[in-house]
């Protein structure tokens, strides 16, 4: 986390990574996420895309090595071995993440839930690849959780 001085006040500014996984409407989703993050005093460090579980794992490892917060957009509507829920479940089975570290994010506008996964000082937020759903899932509760987790 770095501090940036802006005019007469000090602002905390934190960067996070964004990974698109089997996502559509990526440009619209990126704009929607940026808008939500700006309100938190956050920005996007890097944007990458993945179309396979292995590539997603590699990108996630890279992202978590440089950022404490990573957003994954897409893949929630897929089932089987390529579905994001299945991929994250397998990846996290070898970590210290417990069921209490995973929160389901309700989607008022669609069928797919989002997920918030916290392990130590790092967090992964998985959201659907529909901008209107993504924006609505950025509820006051999620914003508050992110702010509290990172001291924003």
Spans of model-derived segments:
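Intrinsic structural disorder
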Residues: 2, 27-31, 39, 58, ...
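Short, Lys/Arg-enriched N-terminal segments with co-localized hydrophobic residues
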Residues: 3-13
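Glycine-rich phosphate/diphosphate-binding loop of Rossmann-like nucleotide-binding domains
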Residues: 11-52
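Structural motif
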Residues: 21-24, 50-61, 74-75, 127-128
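Proline/glycine-rich low-complexity loops and linkers
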Residues: 61, 65-70, 78-151
